[in-house]
């Protein structure tokens, strides 16, 4: 069968997920492309992982094993507590236009601690929708999406 297809370029997992959620089975190819590309532009991506070596970046001294929070690939937060780094990263990402915070927690996270953390985030950002999913991703404690 002949089908019209178009590849939507994304660079992060949250961008890909946002593009998928914008897809309308009833819509035309052109309308879907526009909606997906618009959604991708509106999503901010963050991640929480650990440093694999000592370094200094943008005036931040980082030691191997430190917890780092990245926003759009740039190191924004450095600390030794996963949840505190994630909390600060979310604060860096949320602005007056934000409506939704989505977190995907990794295989090395404690589910009970994550649930408590999500309760705290929901309280802090009570005017936003907050979602959390078990991503089971290696290396990254959290992947964060703010739309």
Model-derived features: positions:
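N-terminal loops that bind phosphate or other acidic moieties
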Residues: 1-147
